Amino acid sequence: MSKKITRRDLTGKEILDILREHKDALKKYKVRKIGLFGSYAKGDQKRKSDIDLLVEFDMAAFDENFRGLFDIFMDLSSYLENLFGKKVDILTPVSVDSIRIKEVSEEIKRSVIYA
């Protein structure tokens, strides 16, 4: 069981360090790569800011219908929110590519910092 982070004033660097420390636990959720973007990556987060993460799943771990991916996604979200004690928004590369405003998707791709 992971220990919940009780500090609410984490920096982007601390979030990345925590993600690196939990790499083995993240493998349980089929995470291939995880990165931070948004206000925490830029260093302009507020006390109520959520944590924005870009997650690339190991798609080879799922069958051709991606059975179980939704459950893994939701479980990962709960795990991370528990870990950080904050709301976590997770995007995948596919969801970033589907953002209609290309400037937004390009900014996410440019600003992501991988753990």
Regions found by a protein language model. Give the residues of each.
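Residue-level recognition of strand-loop junctions within catalytic nucleotide-signaling folds
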Residues: E56-D58
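Catalytic core of pol beta-like nucleotidyltransferases
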Residues: M1-K33, K42-G43, R47, A60-A115
